[in-house]
Amino acid sequence: MSIALLTFDIFGTVLDWRRGLRDALGGRLADDAFDRIVDRQGALERQGFRQYASIVAQSLVEELQLSPEDAARIGAAAGSWPLFPDSAAALRALRAIAPCAATTNSDLAHRAPIEAQLGFPLDGWICAEEVGAYKPDPRVWRAAAERMGVAPGPDWWHVSAYSDYDHATARALGLTCVFVERPHSRPGPADLVVKDLRELAARIG
């Protein structure tokens, strides 16, 4: 098994954004409300690039009727939302197998608090703010290829719980797609399906 690069979606795959958002709202977040927020964020991203924190904030104003001030505070703190329990140890193990990089629809400001939670830096970080586009836009993947020095192909594995954002474009580029069965994940065609990142590390380690 040849793996030259592992790239990861962050929000919803490495970071538990539903729990983070629920905690920020004082423990009140129904499943259908979360799904509406995710869908609204996707619609806003398709309208053109703007900082992810502002997209989070607008989706909360529109779907939950939060005040703009409260919504902006929550959006700015998104990088501090908790990791899934398996993420840090699994990513540490996976970095011993191949370079690990983030491809994320988030802001540069989110990198430091996320890596602080991990306890180590990832080998690369390709975020929407740098690229000026959101996944599934192919520009994100081209930026990752240039940054990491790896051409798209089957030895580049992309790991995500959101096939609609990630795997359609990744598969079109010839990447190996790994689907992670997180709560509220969005499945689609994948080359490998795992229940969490711990299982992925065990399967390919």
PLM regions: where:
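Structured helix-beta-strand junction loops
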Residues: 40, 96-97, 121
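Low-complexity, intrinsically disordered/propeptide-like segments
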Residues: 32, 63, 69, 94-97, ...
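Residues at structural and domain junctions
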Residues: 23, 46, 73-80, 100, ...
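Asp-based, Mg2+/Mn2+-dependent phosphohydrolase catalytic module
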Residues: 1-6, 18, 88, 92, ...
